[in-house]
Regions:
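N-terminal amphipathic, basic helical "cap/leader" segment at the start of enzyme domains
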Residues: 2-148, 317, 323
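Conserved beta-strand/loop scaffold segments within soluble protein domains that form the structured core
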Residues: 108-118, 126-397, 411, 415-449
Length: 449
């Protein structure tokens, strides 16, 4: 199966590379052929590869999806038809339709001088040297077949640039819409650059506007300069036919701060990868994950926190609630390199299987090559406490309501760690509705009403 999956993408590029390049930018095209050769060599990672042991990637890419290589215009008016409201949260709102930045007939967003939120291709045409400095530099195509595939197929994307010492007062919200009349594969690319002392918060919301089979690959590269602060929230509310493979690469300089949060409320199969590297001392990161899955949904989170230098702090907390026949996986690796003294690293994965048929695979790991560190890791997998359920039923609470309350109390810890208060309040509401079976799609979307 894997060889067939790879062959269809190799054949696709060999027959359509001119078309792909025609509708993209020279900077993106400059690395395309090398990425293709890397994919030819690497292929899709098999389960024999440690970081992919829990999810069969070739099966995800096996179906024959359509691709919009000619960049045909997709009829959609996202601002009028699609809303993803977070009450009391004032955002600068942008849309990405499939894998293209949408800039038609949208209200103009006022941004501080020098801040850029725009099409990656557009900026690459205007300032190719700037894009070439960052594009495909930390997302290395010679190390991962999925990243290589995305790099030789991606034709556009989103650029977010925050200049030195600029602090954004408003959250930048990017709504990624999957829209198609046929089964479709999209390949998104996001480049985020925060210069020294910059501060910004980003909320990425993934939604599907049509009940089609979608495959979305996504590569995010984020450069966080010295003394800069990045808050990144990634929320997925799609449907059971959606396949999502997201690789996030973050590079932190000295005394920088990153708060990374991934929330999966509705999906089909989701595979999230986070690679974060400390390049300067005094940096810190907080990585949180909230997963709710039921039926046959699959959610696989894989993280690598690379302490290349000392005096850095990392904290990870991922929590899963699995119902039905859902399957979850978490593998986290904390890597404390030689000479990275005074490292503090905490990695925790806690999981609740609400049924006997739900399955969770967990593998927290630490590799420590320095002797003056404070590092700990742990994981738990359990079911609802029968004694607690009985206690609540004896006091007039129905079994279903008691189950809901215990699940909500369990997942609440990770939600409360999310610093964006309006989003946190919204998630409390959405998670409760999700547990009650009342939330089938994003309730803020006009298309879903």
């Amino acid at each position: 199966m894997a060889m067939f999956s790879e062959k269809q993408y190799l054949d696709l590029y060999q027959s359509s590379s001119r078309m792909i390049k025609k509708h993209s930018a020279e900077v993106l095209n400059a690395v395309r052929d090398a990425a293709f050769e890397d994919f030819r060599r690497l292929g899709f990672p098999s389960r024999k590869v440690e970081r992919y042991k829990y999810t069969d990637m070739s099966a995800i890419f096996e179906p024959d999806y359509g691709l919009n290589l000619n960049r045909l215009e997709i009829p959609v008016d996202p601002y009028q038809a699609f809303r993803c409201d977070v009450p009391n949260l004032s955002t600068s709102l942008y849309f990405v339709v499939n894998d293209a930045f949408y800039n038609k007939a949208l209200p103009k967003v006022e941004l501080p001088e020098g801040v850029i939120v725009d099409s990656l291709c557009k900026v690459a045409a205007e300032n190719p040297e700037f894009i070439a400095k960052y594009y495909a530099k930390i997302a290395k195509t010679d190390e991962d077949g999925i990243t290589a595939l995305n790099t030789f197929l991606a034709q556009d994307g989103l650029l977010i640039y925050i200049p030195k010492n600029v602090k954004l007062d408003r959250t930048v919200q990017v709504i990624n819409i999957l829209r198609s009349d046929v089964d479709l594969m999209v390949n998104r690319r996001v480049l985020i650059v925060l210069e020294q002392g910059a501060e910004a918060k980003f909320l990425f919301c993934d939604h599907a506007a049509d009940d089609k089979n979608f495959l979305a690959t996504q590569v995010i590269e984020a450069y966080v300069g010295e003394n800069a602060s990045l808050d990144l929230y990634c929320l997925e509310e799609t449907h059971y036919k959606n396949r999502r493979v997201s690789n996030v690469y973050i590079e932190q300089q000295a005394n920088s701060r990153v708060n990374h949060n991934v929330i999966t409320l509705h999906n089909g199969i989701t595979r999230n990868r986070l690679d974060l590297v400390f390049k300067g001392e005094g940096a810190e990161c907080f990585c949180n994950g909230c997963v709710i899955a039921d039926k046959n949904q699959v959610v696989d989170n894989n993280t690598l926190i690379d302490h290349q230098v000392g005096h850095c702090t990392s904290n990870e907390l991922y929590k899963y609630v699995l119902d039905g026949e859902a399957r979850g996986a978490f593998a986290g690796r904390g890597w404390d390199r030689h000479g990275a003294q005074k490292t503090t690293a905490q990695e925790t994965n806690q999981n609740l299987c609400a049924t006997k048929t739900a399955r969770m695979f967990t593998q927290p790991m630490l590799e420590i090559y320095a002797d003056d560190v404070k590092c700990a890791h742990g994981s738990t997998v359990g079911q609802l406490n029968d004694a607690a359920l009985f206690y609540m039923q004896q006091r007039g609470v129905s079994r279903e309501e008691a189950k809901l309350l215990l699940q909500f109390a369990f997942i609440n810890e990770v939600i409360d760690k999310m610093e964006l208060e309006p989003l946190r309040d919204r998630l409390h509401h959405l998670v409760e509705k999700r547990f009650r079976g009342e939330l089938n799609k994003c309730e803020g979307c006009k298309l879903c009403k």
